[in-house]
Structures are given as C-alpha cells and as structure tokens.
C-alpha cells in the first residue's frame, strides 16, 4: 500500500508545485495528518465497509474536512472513491519526503544523555548539515541514558553515532576479533 500512497503523494506534490501552493498544501496536510493519525483504524473500517457507497465516503470527507485546499479535497475524494482513506498518513509521509527533497532538508533525531544547550545543538546541527550535505535539518531531541555519554543522530537512514556506548561496542568487537 505504500506504493499506492506514494502515487497519491506525487500527484498532489506535482499539482502543488504547478499551482505555487506547495507551502499551503504542506501546512494543511500536516494539520490533517495530526487530526487523523489516531483514527487510522476507524478509517480502515470505513474503507472496508461494503455497504458504504463512494458517495457516502465523499460525504464523510465533506463533513470532516470543511475548509481545506481544493487540491487536497480532490485527493481525499479520490482516496474515498478507491477505498484508500486510511492511507492518508502514508500519503502525508510520502508528501513530506518529496517536500523535504525539494528543499534539500530532512528530519534529524538527536539523542543524548542530557538536555543539550542551544550552543551544543547548533554545533551538532552544523556537523550534520556538513556530513549529509543538507541545506536544513529539522531537529527533534530525545534523552537516552543508555548512550552513557556523547550523542547519536539519525537522519533518514543515516546514523552518526558519537556515543560512549557505541565506543564500548566497537572496542568489544575489536577484542573479540583478537581472541
């Protein structure tokens, strides 16, 4: 189903670029995703209900999403017609990936054993942007005492691990190779 969501996201992304609505659509899609992320199971029930017609699913869209961008509403209608309303979170993720790629930015999760100061965060973000060649890094921080010390950064599938725990694991592997 991820491939299906990617197609919807790509179509919406292309339309948003063509109509100079990329920022507006991204903002509205973010709000919609937040609103429905805990309701995916109910949306799956709507999708799989054989007695509900496409028109009834469209009425649901109209009732829930009153003042949304017409391009998003049209995409929601297509999702409803094809019994894919429950894919909205996957569509959002795929759209967000396209959006981030367009602006050469990505999300980064920075884990450390304590709350980092703004100066420390700025240094880590600078390091991450240099390592990943991204223009912008959107940061989420987490405290992880298992790291023992240092920090670990996850950007997409890339992990930059400067933690004491990682150093100990690497040292342990070297000792195993020697023995």
Curated annotation (Swiss-Prot):
Which superkingdom does the taxonomy of this entry point to?
Bacteria
* Subcellular locations according to the entry: Cell membrane
Q: Name one GO molecular function term.
A: proton-transporting ATP synthase activity, rotational mechanism
Keywords in alphabetical order, please.
ATP synthesis, Cell membrane, CF(1), Hydrogen ion transport, Ion transport, Membrane, Transport
GO cellular component terms, alphabetically, are: plasma membrane; proton-transporting ATP synthase complex
What Pfam family is a match for this entry? OSCP
Q: How does it sit in the membrane?
A: Peripheral membrane protein
Provide the assembly information: F-type ATPases have 2 components, F(1) - the catalytic core - and F(0) - the membrane proton channel. F(1) has five subunits: alpha(3), beta(3), gamma(1), delta(1), epsilon(1). F(0) has three main subunits: a(1), b(2) and c(10-14). The alpha and beta chains form an alternating ring which encloses part of the gamma chain. F(1) is attached to F(0) by a central stalk formed by the gamma and epsilon chains, while a peripheral stalk is formed by the delta and b chains.
Please give the family membership noted in the entry: Belongs to the ATPase delta chain family.
Name this polypeptide is given = ATP synthase subunit delta
- Species of provenance: Staphylococcus aureus (strain bovine RF122 / ET3-1)
